[in-house]
Every structure is written in structure tokens, then in C-alpha cells.
């Protein structure tokens, strides 16, 4: 096979709607171009610098066909590795290389991986409101669209900030009360089950807002409402506590969106301390490690629910679909509808049909970027308020 030489690499940051989105574009001597998602929206320009200043000089002139070798070279070339900036940069290139390989083979990625395990992957979306009535409206809107798995949040991630017992002059931040959050969320589960019964599966994201002892209490109390899963009940640094939760509650646990390093998930999977791994594909380094993670999890009965928030390009979301269609232990896929300008920049973006995401049949990833449209929406950086999370006394806490 003749080599496919990398002739240029671009890294484009665009903000068509609320979020800064990072896309890597790899050009080759065969006039085949690949696209990848490298979005780390809190630090987009750091990722761009990594691609432009370090990965591009390393890769120009090399054969794009050798994805495995190039992935390892990109990962170890800086010596220090497995952080969010380098992983996202590597992932953007890695996805683009897989996109090129699929286009050269005239195959969609899931065929290149080995074919499909299912007809479609069930999707879930987010219903959130500050009031129960508002939450009911959101639930019914999503149910009417065909969703039978709905993530429900009352007061988003922390209850009612207006009801906090605050200090005299609170430091700036996004405040929440853990006890109030637990009480409100358990009341939400009870109300949803009383109103809707088992018409749909309820998912919920704790977003690592609890102390370990509170997480144990919450997992025990919420079990009676049969959630599909409870997400990120603890921050990664406290995951040793998952064994305590596991021994006292049968509630399904999901975690992984903050993981960057294989050491963060290996013991959790081997010891079966979680039911679902939901890593963010670009945060772990792209398609190449995601395929290996999927196979590793299958050996231990752990299922996959890839992270797919709004601050992610439709290219990255399409990669998730290909992984889900192929990997036997894929369970469900998070999805949030794209705003209008995002669809202009990514015109091939895929949406669910009646609660399912179906295989993409175009060669490669099957979703690209309109570069002219993207350049109409330059990067706009702002400090992120929601990641400045504080307890009522002003103490910083994991967001």
C-alpha cells in the first residue's frame, strides 16, 4: 500500500453558540482530509498551541496509515503524558487519522472497526428545571421526541441557591448546599415515579458534589426509585469509596468523564465497582484508546455510556455513535440537541430518531466541518463560573 503522507495540520477553535469547540484538520497527499474533535472548552487555546506548535512539526511528512504507531509517538514524545491538554490534542489528530482511513477504504468507521453489534444505540437527553412543574414540562417534551431514558435534574447540580444560609459577604462562586441537594433530589425521584411510574428510565448526575459519607447515604436512599444509573457520585480522587457504596446499595453507578489516565479506570473495572464507564473520548486520547477501553470493560461486565455534552463537536459525537454501533458492551449514549449555528458549522451533524442514534453510513466519521462558516465564529474565552463551586461557608468544592 502506498503511503498516505500528512502534508498539513490545522487546529481551528470556533464558538458558534455557547461553547468553544476545537477541531483538528489533517491534510494528505491523496487529497483526502480527516477531521477530529479536540474540544477542551475550558482551555481551548492550550489545545490549539499543542497541535500547532508541537504535534504538527512532529507529524508532517509521516504516513497517516500507521495510526497505532503515531498515537504512541504523540503520547510519549513530550515525556509527560495523560493530561487533558495533550490528550485532547492527540485525540483530535487520532480521530482525523481514522477518518482518513475510513475514507480511503470507502467505509464508515464502525465497519472499519469490525461491523455492528446492534441496529441503533438508545439515547438519553437532559431535563432540568428549578421547579417540579418546569421539570415535568421538560420530561414530557423529551418523551414526545421518543426518549425513553431521561436525565433529570432539579435545581441543576445543587438545589436552590436562593435558599442558602450564606456568609456575610460571600466570595464569588457557584454556591450549593449538599444536604439541600440530597433532600430535593430524593423528592424529585419520588415525584417523578409517582407521576410517571415506569414509563421511562430516570438517570441523574450528582456531578461529584457530595462528601463520601453523603454519597453512601444518597446511594442507599435513591435505590428504591430504580434509577438507570447515578453518575459521578464521587470525584475521581475519592473513587476508593465506591467499594463502600457498592457494598451497601445496588444502585447502578456510572463514572469516567473526568478520567485521562488508564490508571484511573483500571481498578474500578477489574474490581467491578461501577456498572458504566462514561469516559470522554477526546479526554482519553481518541478512538485508538477508546476501542481498547471498550474491550477491556467487556471482559468484566462493565458497560459503556460515553460522555457527550454540549461542549463537544458533532464530529466527536459521531465518533461515539460509531463506537456504540460496533462495541458489544455499549449501553446508551448521552445527547443534547445542537443549536442553529452549530449545525451551520457542522452541517452533517447527526440527531436521534425517536430516541435512537442510528449508524452513520458515510465513509470515515461521516461528519465534517464547514471551515468558512467556522471562521465566522471566532473563539471567545471567559472564566467559567460553574466550575467555581462553593459550599455555603465559601469553601471551594469539586464542580
Swiss-Prot record:
Name of this protein: D-galactonate dehydratase family member ECA0189
Family: Belongs to the mandelate racemase/muconate lactonizing enzyme family. GalD subfamily.
SMART domains: MR_MLE
Residue positions binding D-arabinonate: 207, 257, 278, 307, 334
Keyword annotations from UniProtKB, A to Z: Magnesium, Metal-binding
Gene Ontology MF terms: magnesium ion binding
GO biological process, one term: amino acid catabolic process
Coiled coil: none
Pfam families linked: MR_MLE_C (PF13378), MR_MLE_N (PF02746)
Domain of life: Bacteria
Annotated residues for binding of Mg(2+): 205, 231, 257
General function of this protein: Has no detectable activity with D-mannonate and with a panel of 70 other acid sugars (in vitro), in spite of the conservation of the residues that are expected to be important for catalytic activity and cofactor binding. May have evolved a divergent function.
